[in-house]
């Protein structure tokens, strides 16, 4: 991610903060957004000792951010977002010039996620479609690679 103490970072879909606990101490400002009050509360607990953290319980697409970010990332969250082009375009608009957007998308193409007592609707997409969304938002794809469970994109704002 190329983090340093001067960078501002946004995580879309911060969840319980499992990635944020490693990222937040490495940057100037860390902001995480998630729609789930339960997971935001867990993230608050997990990130309690880190001062430069802001957690937002809200929808990334409708929340009105008051700052721009040097790095925006999202790990396996976009499968929950139906309006992917809108989400990528919003992320691009929140980046500082030269800022990085890192996105991992799940290789699983199921339409639902079984959560035991309920099923959650998913909006899977292909790597090709995701690359198109990123480019249409005015970002340059620097890297694209696959892991066992995901395709990861690293893009940059001009």
What does each model-identified segment do?
Residues 7-13:
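Conserved class I S-adenosyl-L-methionine
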Residues 16-62:
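Class I SAM-dependent methyltransferase SAM/SAH-binding core
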Residues 61-72:
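A short acidic, Gly/Pro-enriched loop at the edge of an enzyme's catalytic core
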Residues 71-83:
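A short SAM/SAH-binding and catalytic strip from SAM-dependent methyltransferases
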Residues 86-97:
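A short glycine-rich, Lys/Arg-flanked "PGG" loop and its adjoining helix->strand segment in the class I
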Residues 98-105:
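Conserved beta-strand signature within the Rossmann-like core of class I S-adenosyl-L-methionine
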Residues 122-137:
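Short alpha-helix
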Residues 139, 145-158:
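Core SAM-dependent methyltransferase catalytic element
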């Amino acid at each position: 991610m190329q983090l340093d103490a001067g960078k501002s970072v946004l995580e879309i879909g911060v969840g319980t903060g499992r990635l944020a606990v490693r990222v937040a101490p490495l940057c100037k400002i860390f902001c995480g957004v998630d729609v789930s009050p339960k997971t935001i509360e867990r993230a608050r607990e997990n990130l309690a000792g880190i001062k430069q953290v802001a957690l937002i319980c809200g929808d990334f697409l409708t929340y009105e951010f008051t700052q721009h970010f040097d790095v925006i990332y999202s790990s396996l969250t976009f499968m929950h977002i139906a309006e992917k082009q809108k989400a990528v375009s919003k992320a691009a608009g929140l980046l500082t010039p030269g800022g990085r957007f890192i996105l991992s998308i799940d290789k699983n193409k199921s339409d639902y996620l079984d959560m035991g007592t309920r099923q959650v609707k998913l909006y899977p997409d292909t790597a090709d479609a995701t690359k198109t969304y990123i480019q249409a938002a005015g970002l340059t794809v620097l890297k694209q690679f696959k892991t066992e469970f995901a395709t990861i994109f690293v893009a940059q704002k001009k």
